[in-house]
């Protein structure tokens, strides 16, 4: 967003204690990678996305993008989940009823409790539940809740630090939804972010996004972050975060991040016949 206005994430109403208390008690930094790990999974060239436009729905987009990667890992198929649904369901957890943003805890808990709403129910190219763009007050038919309930997130896990995040992604567990400072740093022309600058009351804004992959550029590994302002930000909405950037960002009091995985399968959903290699073993 060019004017760095509010985009939908406010760290002041994030309940970190409840967010992390609901996470699986597991330390992904204790994994050690083994075998042939590819330079990237190529997620950015496969996943489909939309722009959030003027709605403060970035938290819903972060959760929907995360869910899309989880779904591909489980089924081998990319399906878009409705960001607006994830947004307003998350607001139910937060107790909010206006277009005023949502917490990461809200969208994660809602994805576990209410599920994610697939946009193309029949997977035939026709979107029964498309993103309503600027229509925050759009109301879904009754059957939407039952359809979403078929596809609930199974677990979340805290992933503090670059190593834990990278291991979670390279373990093919899922993707990582996050929120925090944004707007007062920009990726370079190649999409790379190296210097993190935290948001203050005088600069930038806050935003929710998702780490969906890793990528190796000139021998260096970066985390790939998908942004819901992809028409105006980074490499077609993706930025590549260096280890130093991620470690500095993790120290920002406004930043939260959790990995999510294991979406339940609905009728007609077919799991992959051969599970993707996990690339990791316990240390």
Segments and roles (model prediction):
Residues 1-59, 70-96, 116-139:
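Active-site-adjacent structural segments surrounding the nucleophilic cysteine of cysteine proteases
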Residues 2-9, 54, 64-68, 92-226, ...:
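Predominantly the structural core of cysteine protease catalytic domains
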């Amino acid at each position: 967003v060019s004017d760095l206005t509010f985009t939908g994430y406010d760290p002041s109403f994030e309940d970190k204690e409840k967010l992390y208390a609901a996470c699986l008690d597991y330390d992904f930094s204790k994994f050690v990678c083994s075998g042939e790990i590819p330079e990237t999974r190529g997620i950015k060239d496969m996943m489909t996305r939309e722009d959030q436009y003027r709605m403060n729905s970035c938290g819903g987009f972060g959760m929907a993008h995360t869910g899309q990667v989880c779904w591909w890992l489980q089924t081998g198929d990319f399906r878009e989940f409705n960001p607006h649904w994830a947004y307003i369901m998350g607001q139910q957890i937060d107790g909010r009823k206006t277009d005023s943003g949502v917490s990461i805890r809200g969208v994660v808990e809602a994805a576990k409790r209410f599920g994610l709403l697939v946009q193309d129910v029949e997977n035939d190219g026709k979107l029964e539940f498309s993103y309503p763009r600027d229509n925050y007050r759009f109301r879904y038919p009754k059957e939407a809740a039952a359809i979403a309930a078929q596809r609930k997130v199974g677990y979340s896990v805290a992933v503090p630090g670059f190593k834990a995040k990278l291991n979670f992604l390279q373990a093919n567990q899922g993707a990582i939804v996050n929120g925090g400072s944004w707007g007062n740093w920009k990726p370079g022309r190649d999409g790379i972010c190296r210097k993190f600058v935290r948001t203050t009351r005088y600069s930038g804004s806050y935003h929710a996004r998702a780490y969906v992959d890793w990528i190796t550029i000139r021998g260096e590994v970066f985390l790939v972050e998908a942004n819901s302002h992809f028409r105006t930000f980074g490499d077609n909405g993706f930025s590549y975060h260096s280890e130093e950037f991620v470690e500095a960002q993790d120290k920002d009091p406004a930043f939260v991040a959790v990995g999510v995985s294991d979406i339940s399968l609905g009728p007609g959903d077919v799991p992959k016949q051969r599970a993707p290699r996990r690339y990791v073993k316990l240390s």
